[in-house]
Amino acid sequence: MDHTASQNAQDLIGIPHLGVSGSSTKWHSELSPTEGPHSAGSSTPGFLSPMAELSHPSPPPPALGSLLQLPDGSPSWSMLEVASGPASTQQIKAGVPGRVHNGVSLPTFKNTETATHEAEPPLFQTAESGAIEMTSRKLASATANDSANPLHLSAAPENSRGPALSAEHTSSLVPSLHITTLGQEQAILSGAVPASPSTGTADFPSILTFLQPTENHASPSPVPEMPTLPAEGSDGSPPATRDLLLSSKVPNLLSTSWTFPRWKKDSVTAILGKNEEANVTIPLQAFPRKEVLSLHTVNGFVSDFSTGSVSSPIITAPRTNPLPSGPPLPSILSIQATQTVFPSLGFSSTKPEAYAAAVDHSGLPASASKQVRASPSSMDVYDSLTIGDMKKPATTDVFWSSLSAETGSLSTESIISGLQQQTNYDLNGHTISTTSWETHLAPTAPPNGLTSAADAIKSQDFKDTAGHSVTAEGFSIQDLVLGTSIEQPVQQSDMTMVGSHIDLWPTSNNNHSRDFQTAEVAYYSPTTRHSVSHPQLQLPNQPAHPLLLTSPGPTSTGSLQEMLSDGTDTGSEISSDINSSPERNASTPFQNILGYHSAAESSISTSVFPRTSSRVLRASQHPKKWTADTVSSKVQPTAAAAVTLFLRKSSPPALSAALVAKGTSSSPLAVASGPAKSSSMTTLAKNVTNKAASGPKRTPGAVHTAFPFTPTYMYARTGHTTSTHTAMQGNMDTASGLLSTTYLPRKPQAMHTGLPNPTNLEMPRASTPRPLTVTAALTSITASVKATRLPPLRAENTDAVLPAASAAVVTTGKMASNLECQMSSKLLVKTVLFLTQRRVQISESLKFSIAKGLTQALRKAFHQNDVSAHVDILEYSHNVTVGYYATKGKLVYLPAVVIEMLGVYGVSNVTADLKQHTPHLQSVAVLASPWNPQPAGYFQLKTVLQFVSQADNIQSCKFAQTMEQRLQKAFQDAERKVLNTKSNLTIQIVSTSNASQAVTLVYVVGNQSTFLNGTVASSLLSQLSAELVGFYLTYPPLTIAEPLEYPNLDISETTRDYWVITVLQGVDNSLVGLHNQSFARVMEQRLAQLFMMSQQQGRRFKRATTLGSYTVQMVKMQRVPGPKDPAELTYYTLYNGKPLLGTAAAKILSTIDSQRMALTLHHVVLLQADPVVKNPPNNLWIIAAVLAPIAVVTVIIIIITAVLCRKNKNDFKPDTMINLPQRAKPVQGFDYAKQHLGQQGADEEVIPVTQETVVLPLPIRDAPQERDVAQDGSTIKTAKSTETRKSRSPSENGSVISNESGKPSSGRRSPQNVMAQQKVTKEEARKRNVPASDEEEGAVLFDNSSKVAAEPFDTSSGSVQLIAIKPTALPMVPPTSDRSQESSAVLNGEVNKALKQKSDIEHYRNKLRLKAKRKGYYDFPAVETSKGLTERKKMYEKAPKEMEHVLDPDSELCAPFTESKNRQQMKNSVYRSRQSLNSPSPGETEMDLLVTRERPRRGIRNSGYDTEPEIIEETNIDRVPEPRGYSRSRQVKGHSETSTLSSQPSIDEVRQQMHMLLEEAFSLASAGHAGQSRHQEAYGSAQHLPYSEVVTSAPGTMTRPRAGVQWVPTYRPEMYQYSLPRPAYRFSQLPEMVMGSPPPPVPPRTGPVAVASLRRSTSDIGSKTRMAESTGPEPAQLHDSASFTQMSRGPVSVTQLDQSALNYSGNTVPAVFAIPAANRPGFTGYFIPTPPSSYRNQAWMSYAGENELPSQWADSVPLPGYIEAYPRSRYPQSSPSRLPRQYSQPANLHPSLEQAPAPSTAASQQSLAENDPSDAPLTNISTAALVKAIREEVAKLAKKQTDMFEFQV
């Protein structure tokens, strides 16, 4: 391909195709340094490359064709050479100006030869050597100057040689020079070539001359010395050469070339060398005029070079053509064949006819044909590699055709007038040449870019070689060898040429040698050389430079050495030179080439390199054949052939140098200057040897070393270059001049550039100087050699070449040393072969042959001539396993790239290529696979990068390894940030690809010995931002990381029920479709996130459920009609591995806000979620059908339960139960007990309300209250449960069972109060910074315990005992312990009575309950009331003691403890007492019965007295009085004895008295019994505590300071007080209460409930109650501030309490509550003021909050009764005056009531004091009246219960 391009480029440039031979060769060399890859093998390839790169006058390639087309065979030949050289040069220029010049050097050599021909006829006469010299110089200068000229030349290909050649130059020579100029100093080499004695010598010198110096090279002048070359021995040749050199001065040289008539093909060639040594056609020289004609045709300058001599130069142009393209090498070969003819021309002076005959193709044509055919096989390879134009076979054919044409075959091939031209060529080959070459040129040029040349070649039967053929036959051969070898190799080194060349060489060599006679041999040698050249080209392709430096380099070296060796062996001089060449390296290669030329056959062999050399040798050996076939003397043809072969063998420049050298000593290896040439050759040989040695090393330098021309090697090694230069110079003047070290380095530089090897790159720099044309030529040769080298590996004729190439290719170690990346088995490609041989010896030869075959296949597959296969491992079992890697210079291709390219190339093609080199190959079992198996697809992931620079070759291992390191850093960072771990993650890039400016990296991530799944690795790297990933990779990522394969779940129709559809808007068309796995995966991830989000939202409903894992599988993505590009996503979801029904999944997604969904999906959501199958399975309906009835049944049951429980609920509303829930459960238990005691206390309170019982109520109040308190704390729960069981409606409390209701209410109140007090206590504690909670808790507990004790006290007889039982009092205070012991003793006795009475009372109460239930009420408090009655009895009995206890704080303190101790008994008794109270047993005093009845009535009355004022005061009193209740109850004990009860004949009075008595009994129980024991303890505690706390504790606040002990007792008294005072109020103070406090209605509800009810009332009352509570705390604090002890129990507390009460009384609610508190039995009226303060306390507030209490109180106790009972019970101890005073305070609200109650309280207290010691007095207290009153009350209550209930509700 490259060759074709080269040719085309040359044509474009206007370089004559004929010139390609010599020029091309040089050109290639130059190119190769310049272009690097292109410089391989062929000038054309190089040229193409540059052309592509530069918009240089690349077009010249066609011009080249044109030049070739020049009419004159001579001009044509010159043109060919020039084209060859110039093309190369131009190519280089096109590609890189610097490179161009470098590359030109080699082409210059060829051009030089052309130039020689180009040179004036004298140059021709000079034999080829003179012409060559001239050409070389001309070429060199021309090259430098005429870079563009070649284009011009091409422009005028058909025109007269002058115009055509010189687009810049007048003659065809000008085009050649142009090319050369581009090539720069190629001509120099030609100068060095002396005409060998043999005919061929002259041609060779011409060829050498053909090497044209670059424009800047003055050295071309020296080159002219080439005259020694004249094969004919004609001395005119040198002059011609000189002329050429002159023309080499650049543009003018062409003219000189023109001077060369076709008769001296050499001269003509020299003439060609003129400008750029464009007329390197010198090879056309005399040898084969027919050849020349062909060359002319190729050149297309035929017209320009009408003259035969000029025609030859024109031929050179065609040669150039071949050089430019891959085929050009073949063309060069053809040219060489032509050259062979040319040599006849050159010999023309000497043996023009003989050579002409050869060229004539008389023999040649036949031979040529054969050879062409044979060559074609070779050529085919070459062609494929080189030119698209010429088939490889064509190229080969062309080459051989060229020879043939020169022989006659080429002519024949040249449709135009191949034979005729050839025939005419002898006489006036230029004309014929023009025609013939034109034809050839046309074909060549198109394929190579030198279409004309290619075509010409094809026409000639070697279409690729057409251009080459055009090169003079004799010279053409040389040129062909040089040009093809150098130019093509250089360009082919690009890839194409090399492979073909290899094939070509073997075929060519064999066929050519055999087929061609002397002329043919010469040509054949060129052919062989061409083969070699092609190999060289291949190497150059590797690098045209590659050839030099790349493995081809080593191969080339080896080949060259072998060639040289062969040449040396075959030809004595050549052999020696050849030998020297290996030694000298750079010089030697030239020498070898020259030597080969000189040796003719030997030279050819050597030139070919192993194969070529062999072939050449054979050809040389067959000089007879040649001679026989060729008309011209065999010697001449042989010489020509040798020269050609030598040239071909070497890179074109090298060949040129060799030709020059040969020209000097062509026959002897020193023609004109035999000694000089010999020495030069020797030097070259030495250099070559050295270089050869290096070359095998596979370094560019080595390659260069391998070549005689140091220039190529100079890239790597300047020394070599120098030696080469020296050698060349030594060999011949011209040669020496040409071989200037500077120039050579420059050429090599170009080649090196082409070569991937760094050495080559270095070499180009080394060869930067291009002073000597010879150097340029040498460089060209070197490039060619390099190219050849690779081809040799591939070449058939590899007897020598193959091993050398093999060594180079196989020696991976040597190659690896210069490779740009670290080699490992990961870069190896594995190919498995089946061989026919059972036993295969794995030898170096087998390795070499396989390497050659693989190289050939790779070059064809990559379409590059500089690609080489390096076999690293060769294993054999039943088959052969080959492990190799592909390189291009220093670049190593990734296995994936090689596998892909070979896969495209095809197994059959690879097999065919391998069979050419390994005949035993049976088949290819495994075409190509990675040596290490690749990880599975699901391990692989890809990253897509943008803006990867063109400089980065993504196919190279260097790029891959760099990206691996960067990716590793990125992954390590991601792992550290995301996983907080650090492990040695490794990256292995599997493949790279480039599409639409985005580079895709496919790689795997390994963790030690295992690989990460692609999904895992991609998700890890995706955690990093795109910016960060771009930072690590240095390129912005288009896709950060994406798995190559996605694990897909089942997406068949079986999952249809689970499908869900979501419609998005704004989805790009490129994203829709399942093929776009990336988008599908992204949407799956985002949808899974949405499911997780919905689950998180649902967690608040299902806290226990843990988030499961959702997996989303995309089923399909499709476009749907609608605006904004809607796309429909169908997917289904797995939750914890189980699929979700579509309906369920859609429902889940529908819970997510559409906006959030859009933000998550990054697209507008048109449809959130819609199930595909919308009807859920039938089983759902079944489930629903089953669940529905169950649900209905459940609802019905719930409703029934609610209805059945409604009564209880209603009863509890006013009761403590409502508040109890507010209280802690433990408090409930206490509440429960309190309720029992409280209810009883309430009954007792009711009794005291009846003035008769007023005395009892005080002690009873205290005791019961304390009990209640204890119950509050300890028995609230029990109370609750009991209440729940016995829950009565509020009206029940007021009903006949009012005793019970009163008791429960008081009990309830007590719990409520406890709760309220706790609240207050908390508030107070907050204010005091006291841990209220603890105190409250303690208070509640103690309160409960006191309540428990109080409940037993509730029984009037056992009240004292119950109180004593209260454990709290006893443990608390030691003094109380004594009292508690007394009380306990009393209690024990009382308990027995109480138990008795309880049974009766419970029986009675049960009856009452039944009645109440019938009426819709449940007398929950009844039980408590019974207990309360029992306790009351006890309290009455112990009243005096309890009073004392009350007075004594210690006793109080003990009392609570006692209560707590007795709590268990009390609890048990509570239940029983409740029952007994419910049905008072006869054992109980009438008082108890009265109390029992009274309570219900009280409850009724409470409802009746539910006036707002009463409630308010009640509440106030409850709060304040409760605490006071303690103190007062204690005080009251004394005062209460002075009964303040005013006996009232009316039932109301009786009931009031009952309540009073009950209250007093409770107060006595708490104050006396509990008070002395418990109460006194409580009192003591109260003393310790501020009075207010004590007071508060009664409601619930006092407990805090007292640690709850006092609080409990206090609380009870309060509850009892509440219950009792309320009845008192009810009887006497109701009206005033109403007046005093507007809010009573609410309190009345709570009234019956004691504390709990008060609390309820607080909540019920609402703001008022809360206000009261809020104010309550302050008073409570005030009270707290003054400890109870501090306050004189009576006065102080009274005063404060009164004040507080008054204050509260100011508030309606507080006033009301205060009044009830005052009424409590435990605290007689004195407490009225205190109760308000307590109400101010939180406790009071809580009481106030009790709405139920007021109602119950209203039902059971009239406010007046309360007030009366309160003063009596409350202030029993305080003086009556105190009571009044206190009353006066509340009296603000209702003074009369206060006053009235005071006396009654006093009386009751007194009576209580009297009665307390014994139960009898209490029992005797108007028992009959009380019973009667109770009964009446019960009746009234029964009547009022309904109303009451309603009110309470």
Swiss-Prot record:
The chain crosses the membrane at residues 1180-1200. Residues 958-986 form a coiled coil. It is found in: Membrane. Keywords: Coiled coil, Membrane, Transmembrane, Transmembrane helix. Disulfide bonds: none annotated. Belongs to the UPF0606 family. The keyword Signal does not apply. Residues 1-10, 529-541, 552-586, 1290-1319, 1463-1482, 1537-1546 have a biased composition (Polar residues). It is a single-pass membrane protein. Residues 1769-1786, 1795-1809 have a biased composition (Low complexity). GO terms for cellular component: membrane. Residues 1-70, 142-166, 213-242, 529-586, 1258-1338, 1460-1546, 1656-1679, 1769-1819 are annotated as: Disordered. This is UPF0606 protein KIAA1549L. Its main location: membrane. The gene is KIAA1549L. It comes from Homo sapiens.
